[in-house]
């Protein structure tokens, strides 16, 4: 049967009415319902944060919740919004790791504050399109101001620039794309080699794969006793590749590794890069925030010599996911890789030769990620942010001090930028394999208790317990109680009875 457009929509209207459902996306009545629920939610989330320490760090869903969600279909007809809201609170949001918990010490914990959450809510409500100046001119200006401020902190020159992206993975990928296009011709790509340490974040290799490099083009450089890149090993690897007619083109250094918080010798690496005409990228996703600390920023000496820098605000600058930046020494390198001027965007260009954010990275449609950081910084201030960084470092140093006082434990990697690694070794004669199992079980027992979360990692072939103490709400009491709990786990208690 053929319908005119009017008949088609009339039939839809009739079917909806006959089915007893006439739901539009935007109605005054529904907006009132959403407003009431939002008021309720705000009160609930404030109470949740006020009582965060009473919550279990890890909240595991039961089997019934998974089965319920698995069977839940996408409905043909809409459901009451309060039902969906309550269902999501109960089944989804109540069954997540609380990365923002003061005793969440695994991975790189979230330090997200309610300020950032508020910025998220505001930005998502107004939904600015942050691809170019004409779409959101004030938001565009805020992003430019923040990028300039962060470039200044990194010691970059006036021709530097960058943009906000979703996270460190995309920041690193964006920088490596610029490095490839700056340093290599098309024919040179197949022989190109990039260098990184055995502590480099996995996102680097993944990004290289995405932009056309294979694993055979990556050289993993050994680290020294402090888990920093060995410069002698780096130079040897480069010389071998040159003799084999390869093309060394980039070195990735870490400013705060995920495992240990170690900072590679940035100044020495910059010398190598200049000597061999290579791109110098610093993955500062975690550690770059230390630039705000007057006391610890010296640990990042040499970062100002890099060609590019990734920096996650959602790690140590109180931001919700995802809020990251890629900074580049010469913004024209990003333009060279990403500039696009299709005919359908010409009316959105400020001038014929204007540079918009779609010219600086892989995204066209992009949210205004900078606004929540702007709200946070305007409210908290740079000095307090620096104190937050210093507090996180101090908590790791306290953890190291406590662990060293007990001969049953050994420090494997001392406190660096808020991260410390240690291992239960006991006074008994045990194999390394048995010690690995014991430390894994200690981690599991502490995490399953809900009191704290401590995951393991591996350093020099050993299973170790790792604590990242960067949450500004973490107190000395939290550290003492957590380390006391480690000593009282059933695993250690049972060993003491043998």
Task: Walk through the language-model features, giving the residues of each.
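PLP-dependent enzyme catalytic core of the Aspartate aminotransferase-like
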Residues: 459-498
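Short, positively charged and aromatic/hydrophobic N-terminal segments
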Residues: 2-19
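N-terminal entrance/gating region of PLP-dependent enzymes' catalytic architecture
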Residues: 24-159, 447-452, 470, 474, ...
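Short loop-beta-helix segment that forms the pyridoxal 5′-phosphate
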Residues: 150-174, 219-222
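Conserved PLP-enzyme active-site core in the AAT-like
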Residues: 170-335
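Conserved PLP-binding catalytic core of the aspartate aminotransferase-like
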Residues: 411-446
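Short beta-strand
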Residues: 410-416, 454-459
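Active-site C-terminal subdomain of aminotransferase-like
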Residues: 276, 301-404
């Amino acid at each position: 049967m053929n319908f005119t457009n009017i008949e088609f929509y009339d039939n839809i209207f009739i079917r909806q009415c006959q089915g007893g459902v006439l739901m539009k996306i935007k109605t005054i009545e529904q907006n009132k319902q959403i407003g009431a629920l939002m008021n309720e939610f705000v009160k609930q989330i404030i109470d949740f944060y006020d009582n965060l320490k009473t919550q279990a760090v890890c909240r595991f869903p039961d089997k019934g919740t998974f089965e319920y969600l698995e069977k839940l279909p996408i409905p043909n007809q809409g459901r009451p919004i309060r039902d969906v809201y309550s269902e999501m609170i109960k089944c989804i949001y109540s069954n997540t790791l609380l990365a923002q918990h003061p005793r969440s010490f695994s991975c790189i914990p979230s330090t997200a504050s309610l300020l950032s959450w508020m910025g998220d809510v505001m930005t998502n409500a107004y939904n600015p399109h942050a691809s170019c100046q004409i779409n959101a001119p004030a938001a565009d200006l805020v992003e430019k101001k923040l990028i300039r401020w962060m470039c200044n902190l990194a010691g970059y020159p006036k021709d530097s620039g960058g943009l906000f992206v979703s996270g460190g993975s995309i920041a690193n990928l964006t920088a490596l794309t610029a490095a490839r296009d700056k340093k290599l011709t098309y024919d040179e790509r197949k022989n190109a080699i990039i260098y990184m340490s055995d502590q480099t974040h996995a996102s680097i290799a993944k990004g290289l794969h995405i932009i056309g490099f294979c694993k055979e083009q990556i050289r993993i450089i050994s680290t020294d006793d402090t888990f920093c890149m060995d410069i002698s090993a780096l130079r040897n690897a480069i010389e071998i590749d040159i003799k084999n007619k390869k093309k060394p083109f980039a070195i990735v250094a870490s400013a705060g590794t995920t495992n240990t918080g170690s900072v590679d010798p940035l100044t020495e690496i910059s010398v190598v890069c200049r000597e061999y005409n290579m791109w110098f990228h610093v993955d500062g996703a975690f550690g770059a925030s230390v630039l705000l600390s007057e006391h610890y920023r010296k640990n990042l000496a040499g970062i100002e010599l890099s060609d590019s820098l990734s920096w996650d605000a959602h790690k140590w600058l109180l931001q919700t996911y995802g809020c990251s930046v890629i900074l580049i020494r010469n913004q024209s390198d990003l333009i060279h890789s990403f500039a696009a001027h299709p005919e359908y965007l010409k009316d959105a260009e400020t001038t014929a030769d204007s540079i918009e954010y779609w010219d600086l990275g892989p995204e066209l449609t992009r949210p205004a990620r900078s606004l929540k950081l702007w709200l946070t910084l305007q409210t908290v201030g740079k000095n307090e942010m620096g104190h937050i960084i210093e507090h996180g470092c101090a908590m790791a140093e306290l953890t190291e001090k406590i662990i060293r006082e007990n001969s049953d434990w050994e420090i494997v990697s001392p406190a660096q930028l808020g991260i410390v690694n240690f291992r239960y070794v006991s006074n008994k004669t045990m194999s390394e394999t048995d010690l690995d199992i014991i430390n894994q079980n200690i981690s599991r027992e502490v995490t399953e208790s809900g009191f704290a979360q401590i995951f393991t990692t591996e350093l020099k072939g050993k299973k170790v317990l790792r604590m990242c103490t960067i949450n500004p709400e973490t107190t000395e009491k939290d550290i003492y109680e957590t380390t006391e709990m480690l000593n009282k786990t059933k695993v250690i208690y049972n060993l003491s009875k043998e």
